[in-house]
Amino acid sequence: MKHIRNFSIIAHIDHGKSTLSDRLIQICGGLTEREMAAQVLDSMDLERERGITIKAQSVTLDYHAKDGETYQLNFIDTPGHVDFSYEVSRSLAACEGALLVVDAGQGVEAQTLANCYTAMEMDLEVVPVLNKIDLPAADPDRVSQEIEDIVGIDATDAVRCSAKTGVGVPDVLERLVRDIPPPEGDPEGPLQALIIDSWFDNYLGVVSLVRIKNGTMRKGEKIKVMSTGQIYNADRLGIFTPKREDTDVLNCGEVGWLVCAIKDILGAPVGDTLTLARHPAEKALPGFKKVKPQVYAGLFPISSDDYEAFRDALGKLSLNDASLFYEPESSTALGFGFRCGFLGLLHMEIIQERLEREYDLELITTAPTVVYEVQTTDGETVYVDSPGKLPPLNNIEELREPIAECHMLLPQEYLGNVITLCIEKRGVQTNMVYHGNQVALTYDIPMAEVVLDFFDRLKSTSRGYASLDYNFKRFTASDMVRVDVLINSERVDALALITHRDNSQYRGRELVEKMKDLIPRQQFDIAIQAAIGNHIIARSTVKQLRKNVLAKCYGGDVSRKKKLLQKQKDGKKRMKQVGNVELPQEAFLAILHVGKDSK
């Protein structure tokens, strides 16, 4: 056991985690030169296209160190985006140490800080690594000073390397073996294995990634899931070298995969403990804290025949992504679908894309909303995650919206722009600290504003230099109203949105104007209105298509023309009473862009 090292690689987006993993795999000979590809651990097509890591991946490598010993390295490559921070904390729970990778040109960013604090809270050994020293802009001395000032860990002897060219990577491995402690645990004790992650394989059923904390796991043994008491047979187990390799035994301290013919998706939830059926452990390992979704949106299949397939797909996906929440929902405009909870907008986009790609579904998304806390006049407190569930205005005593605490790190020259943006987003400054040329800003900003487009606009006002990390802080009373959209005097539930009263006129008007361009013209006038309660705040009309009924009249009496026009008018009136309006998919997407273009 003293030759095992478990560690994660944590870093801000684009600081070179996945490239460093590639180098480690190459040096330790995990894959042959022919099998090597760039970002070999980003196995999903989506990850490669966007150049980001979404799922944490684990690899077991053998490293022949300079002291003549052979060490087994189990490492987990983690995502850098704030939306996937849950993946990071799960990966860290399986490790004794972490490599904190910092870009030697850009320096410390908000996500570096957040992930590093997560690692420190779990008492992990953090080894700082300065990456990209081959860049002309690299300034390792300034950055190591920054790590000490902002993060507060000793970085005087931080390893300097370039994952792209391979310079200094062997030093990273040596430092790992030296500084990160071996796993603790009792190889002779009863088996306790933590499920770090699981996914669904069409041939094998549920595949789980486990970290053996105590005892050993052998092929063919009866395994018991502690939370449900179910007993399964360990059919196959093994390690990733990134390829899946079978082994007969997983020893104490190792990280490996396990297949035990679980067909039920909820059979072995992530964060659960596995033990032996004949000699069970007394208590389960502490799992992971449940994450609360921050953003909710309705997802509906375009054709109602896909509902069953959509439900199965969500089940399989939620096995692989424990932070996804979903419950059935029906809408008069869109039929049956699911209300899903996500950690952020990027998470939502990724899930929608994965559903459409991996499971061949066509989906409509409604506008994302956050959770509001509502105090009703009866003294009850209810939590509302969609505009449709909001009680009528006269039943609401107080409406509270979630406030996010946002930590931003940015160069001084962009400070003015960023503060202006925060004020526009109704933010309140709580802290500001200067570290050399960097400024650390803390603002309390309503979650609804953060999830909408705050991140994109923060990046554009600071030319990409500012970085953001946010977490939920509290609920605060606020003057929020629901804006309904009426089409021909009928409310369309899927188009409603909750917004602040100050912005409601403007939002309503903008939404109505956008819808006007998107709804195809019919044989009769279509009135599009935005309303708060019974009060109409904006209206526009999609003009009817009409035939020129006077074309056949050459001269003649005016009463003849009047008669024809009146006849047409009556016909249109009748049509309007029975006609219904088909809304195109773009109309639902219009709400997503309300408030983005003009500011």
Swiss-Prot record:
Catalytic activity: GTP + H2O = GDP + phosphate + H(+)
Its EC number(s): 3.6.5.n1
Keywords: Cell inner membrane, Cell membrane, GTP-binding, Hydrolase, Membrane, Nucleotide-binding, Protein biosynthesis
Main location: membrane
Protein's membrane topology: Peripheral membrane protein
Location in or out of the cell: Cell inner membrane
GO biological process: positive regulation of translation
Annotated GO MF terms: GTP binding; GTPase activity; guanosine tetraphosphate binding; ribosome binding; translation elongation factor activity
A Pfam family this chain is assigned to: GTP_EFTU
Annotated residues for binding of GTP: D14, H15, G16, K17, S18, T19, N131, K132, I133, D134
Organism domain of life: Bacteria
Function: Required for accurate and efficient protein synthesis under certain stress conditions. May act as a fidelity factor of the translation reaction, by catalyzing a one-codon backward translocation of tRNAs on improperly translocated ribosomes. Back-translocation proceeds from a post-translocation (POST) complex to a pre-translocation (PRE) complex, thus giving elongation factor G a second chance to translocate the tRNAs correctly. Binds to ribosomes in a GTP-dependent manner.
HAMAP family: LepA
Protein name: Elongation factor 4
Protein's organism: Erwinia tasmaniensis (strain DSM 17950 / CFBP 7177 / CIP 109463 / NCPPB 4357 / Et1/99)
